[in-house]
């Protein structure tokens, strides 16, 4: 547990000191998809206005539904208005065999970067891993400039 806490603290510090433009929280709400049909990662991600995330991962024959979990939103400082200056949201998935941290960063009105960190908890000796990908807002859900 201490190790997980240290990892989370490291990720938060990394996010705070990274050079990222601020975004309206509205940019983080919506349905996003992976443009590459051959992805081995996340295929779809939905962020709701009530601070929930729903993720689907690549599986065969149909995508794996990770379900809805709450997100935490991060701003540039302790007094930031998160509606106007959201920098990241994060969520934790715990399906029983692993603990997965999902970190979402808005890139622009219709594009997000997703980083996924997975640590296996089932004593399988599988190596913890991470991947990063860019998802685009579904065209029928795109924000109008």
Q: Which role does the model predict for each range below?
A:
Residues 1-4:
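Positively charged n-region of N-terminal signal peptides that target proteins for export
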Residues 17-23:
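Sec/Tat signal peptide C-region and signal peptidase I cleavage site
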Residues 23-32:
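Cleaved targeting-peptide boundary
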Residues 34-100, 140:
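Central antiparallel beta-sheet cores of small beta-barrel/beta-sandwich binding domains
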Residues 72-75, 118-145:
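Edge beta-strand at a domain terminus
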Residues 112-114:
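Cysteine-centric segments in proteins
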């Amino acid at each position: 547990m201490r190790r997980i806490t240290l990892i989370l603290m490291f990720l938060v510090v990394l996010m705070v000191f990274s050079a990222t433009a601020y975004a309206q929280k509205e940019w983080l709400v919506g349905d996003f998809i992976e443009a590459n049909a051959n992805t081995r990662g996340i295929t779809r991600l939905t962020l709701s206005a009530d601070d929930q995330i729903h993720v689907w991962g690549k599986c065969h024959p149909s995508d794996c539904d990770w379900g809805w979990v709450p997100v935490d939103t991060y701003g540039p400082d302790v007094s930031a208005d998160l509606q106007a200056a959201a920098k990241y949201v994060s969520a934790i998935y715990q399906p029983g065999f692993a603990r997965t941290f999902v970190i979402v960063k808005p890139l622009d009105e219709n594009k997000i970067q997703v980083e996924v960190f997975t640590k296996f908890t089932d004593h399988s000796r599988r190596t913890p891993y991470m991947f990063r990908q860019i998802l685009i807002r579904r065209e029928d859900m795109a924000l109008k400039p």
